[in-house]
Swiss-Prot record:
Organism: Dictyostelium discoideum
EC number(s) from the headed UniProt entry: 1.3.5.1
Span of the transit peptide along the chain: 1-24
Protein name: Succinate dehydrogenase [ubiquinone] flavoprotein subunit, mitochondrial
Protein task: Flavoprotein (FP) subunit of succinate dehydrogenase (SDH) that is involved in complex II of the mitochondrial electron transport chain and is responsible for transferring electrons from succinate to ubiquinone (coenzyme Q).
Positions with a binding annotation for substrate: H274, T286, H385, R429
Quaternary structure and interacting proteins, as annotated: Component of complex II composed of four subunits: a flavoprotein (FP), an iron-sulfur protein (IP), and a cytochrome b composed of a large and a small subunit.
Biological or metabolic pathway of the protein: Carbohydrate metabolism; tricarboxylic acid cycle; fumarate from succinate (eukaryal route): step 1/1
UniProt-listed GO biological process terms: defense response to Gram-negative bacterium; mitochondrial electron transport, succinate to ubiquinone; mitochondrion organization; phagocytosis; positive phototaxis; tricarboxylic acid cycle
Any one annotated GO CC term: phagocytic vesicle
Gene3D superfamilies to which the protein is assigned, alphabetical: FAD/NAD(P)-binding domain, Fumarate reductase/succinate dehydrogenase flavoprotein-like, C-terminal domain, succinate dehydrogenase protein domain, Succinate dehydrogenase/fumarate reductase flavoprotein, catalytic domain
Tele-8alpha-FAD histidine found at: H77
Highest taxon of the lineage: Eukaryota
Length: 626
């Protein structure tokens, strides 16, 4: 409905602030805003794999559901996932979901919560079969069963039986196939989509989530969505870095909304570098290329991974392979005039195999590297790919905060996918566990809402000032009169993150990074210049809001990394080279006071107990080698 009576005060100018939200106290101009109000049982923010699976599940169950997305659903970044989705189907070889869980716990470097890992790996098989029934066009074996390929960090018989073949694939376009299928199912079940709406903030009341505020990009109108359940499924924040496989839309908007609401994010220091981003462009070359038999080379033409991972070589976990590449480059065995990258060789594979199983890779390599993969290797380099950290949740998707050192559920708020930290990935994600994560926990959220929310539950009125702070922030950005453009500040942030929170880290570099990123954040607040003052398709405004979101997470990532005095998974410190379970086998909870810029770090224990010890025993920590 259109609420013409609601008057929100527009605050144009601002005092300088050390925080990430401006302080509005110097000048104000009163202007009436006509705000469009909506009421739904549930709203889902984001329309990638997790968001669509949650929205589809909710509409299937009869809930009035809205899915709000800043871009068309099939442009969501899930579409770029290539390699596949893990499930112990046992089509290509004997397999067991417990072996999958073992590999996931080991891959997480024992920071993964074993109750959530238990749930995800057990649910993997029915989840993939459900996707098949929905219509995902998986590649097929000769007997008609779903094709499975080898992927990194995966084994049989709890690490004792050799390489597992567990990754279910639709050639090298699995994410594309999955996303289009889920979108079709969501449309079939009459999910209401609000496309090209940018969600700015959560609406909170007494610690509970009541909905969200959004901008309609087409006409600049403000919309308030009231709901009993709000699901955040907005993906990661890879674009905080200079070189990333992520789309430019991957700005972690949901994470930042949660942070602005005074809630924590978890384990943001763990950022995955994929071993095979194309040198120069950062475009992803799937791990499936190595699963099909590809291997890495240094400048001597040596296949070097057997030196670092004797048992599995190029199919070690991603953090191990990325560090190995970096060591080769550091020790002068890099390729090219600058000796700053490695090569991925596929030339020994037949063109028929490549065309059948890796057609997209052949095309991508030609477009972005000028390489015919049947004749020459692809230049590659470790590239930011995935955020293990995010919004802390339990395995049901309910968002967690801490009160007096104890976990507390945030009523009405859920998260799933890369924006969430369940935590099934811990300190390092295994390849092909991401598509599994988004579908399993997108469905889990819908199931939990069904268990806790009665249909036709009446809605309470929203707080009368709901949305005021969000609109004040929008106007503060629109009327910023500093000296630096959004693009200039964004580039500075990305280069700081690329340099100071990289594959290898140490205390001095991280301490410098904390100082630099805090200074960059202050520059965003105090010296931003925008030129478009309108509200209709104002890309200057939206990019600035996205930068604000990225900066929020970049600050917490750097502070969290500087504080963690150990090496674990993707967080590899040269001054603390060993994993320290006695002091650091715990999750980081990071808070940011957006008004003052103050960062607070707390910690919560890793869940080491499985859901059912008789079904799956706890996997105790051991030294992680491949």
């Amino acid at each position: 409905m259109l609420s013409s009576a609601l008057k929100l005060t527009k605050k144009v100018c601002s005092t300088k602030s050390n925080g990430l939200i401006r302080s509005f106290s110097t000048q104000t101009q009163s202007r009436d805003y006509a705000v469009v109000d909506h009421t739904y049982d549930a709203i889902v923010v984001g329309a990638g794999g997790a968001g669509l699976r949650a929205a589809l599940g909710l509409t299937e169950k009869g809930y009035k559901t809205a899915c709000i997305t800043k871009l068309f659903p099939t442009r969501s970044h899930t579409v770029a996932a290539q390699g596949g989705i893990n499930a112990a189907l046992g089509n290509a070889d004997q397999d067991d979901w417990r072996w999958h869980a073992y590999d996931t716990v080991k891959g997480s470097d024992f920071l993964g919560d074993q109750d959530a890992i238990h749930y995800m790996c057990k649910e993997a098989v029915p989840t993939v079969l459900e996707l098949e029934q929905y219509g995902v066009p998986f590649s097929r074996m000769d007997d008609g069963r779903i094709y499975q390929r080898a992927f990194g960090g995966q084994s049989k018989n709890f690490g004792k039986g050799g390489q597992a073949t567990r990754c279910c694939a639709a050639a090298d376009r699995t994410g594309h196939a999955l996303l289009h299928t889920l979108y079709g199912q969501a449309v079939k079940h009459n999910t209401k989509f609000f496309i090209e709406y940018f969600v700015t903030d959560l609406i909170m009341e007494n610690g509970d989530c009541r909905g969200v505020v959004a901008i309609n990009l087409e006409d600049g109108t403000i919309h308030r969505f009231r709901s009993h359940a709000t699901v955040i499924a907005t993906g990661g924040y890879g674009r905080a870095y200079f070189s990333a496989t992520s789309a430019h839309t991957c700005t972690g908007d949901g994470n930042a909304m949660v942070i602005r609401a005074g809630l924590p994010c978890q384990d943001l220091e763990f950022v995955q570098f994929h071993p095979t981003g194309i040198y120069g462009s950062g475009c992803l070359i799937t791990e499936g290329a190595r699963g099909e038999g590809g291997y890495l080379l240094n400048s001597s033409g040596e296949r070097f991974m057997p030196r670092y991972a004797p048992s599995v070589a190029d199919l070690a976990s991603r953090d191990v392979v990325s560090r190995s590449e970096t060591m080769e480059i550091r020790e002068g065995r890099g390729v090219g005039p600058e000796k700053d990258h490695c090569l991925l060789n596929l030339t020994h594979l037949s063109p028929e195999i490549i065309d059948e199983r890796l057609p997209g890779i052949r095309e991508t390599a030609m477009i972005f590297a000028g390489v015919d993969v049947t004749k020459e290797p692809i230049p590659v380099i470790p590239t930011v790919h995935y955020n293990m950290g995010g919004i802390p949740t339990n395995y049901k998707g309910q968002v967690i905060t801490q009160v007096d050192g104890k976990d507390k559920l945030v009523k009405g708020l859920y998260a799933a996918g890369e924006s969430a930290c369940v935590s099934v990935h811990g300190a390092n994600r295994l390849g092909a566990n991401s598509l599994l994560d988004i579908v399993v926990f997108g469905r889990a959220v819908a199931n939990e809402i069904e268990n806790t929310l009665a249909k036709d539950t009446p809605h309470k009125p929203l707080p009368p000032n709901a949305g005021e702070e969000s609109i004040a922030n929008i106007d503060a950005i629109r009327f910023s009169n500093g000296t630096r453009s959004t693009a200039e500040i964004r580039l500075e942030m990305q280069k700081i993150m690329q340099r100071n929170a990289a594959v290898f880290r140490d205390g001095q570099v991280l301490k410098e990074g904390v100082e630099l990123i805090d200074k960059c954040a202050r520059s965003l607040i105090n010296d931003l210049k925008t030129t478009d003052r309108t509200m209709i398709w104002n890309t200057d405004l939206i990019e600035s809001l996205e930068l604000q979101n990225l900066m929020t997470q970049a600050v917490l990532t750097m502070h969290s990394a500087e504080a963690r005095k150990e090496s674990r998974g993707a967080h590899a410190r040269e001054d603390y080279k060993e994993r320290d379970d006695a002091n650091w086998m715990k999750h980081t909870l990071s808070y940011l006071d957006v008004n003052t810029g103050k960062v607070t770090l707390n910690y919560r224990p890793v869940v080491s107990e499985t859901l059912d010890q008789s079904e799956m025993e706890t996997i105790k920590p051991f030294k992680r080698v491949y």
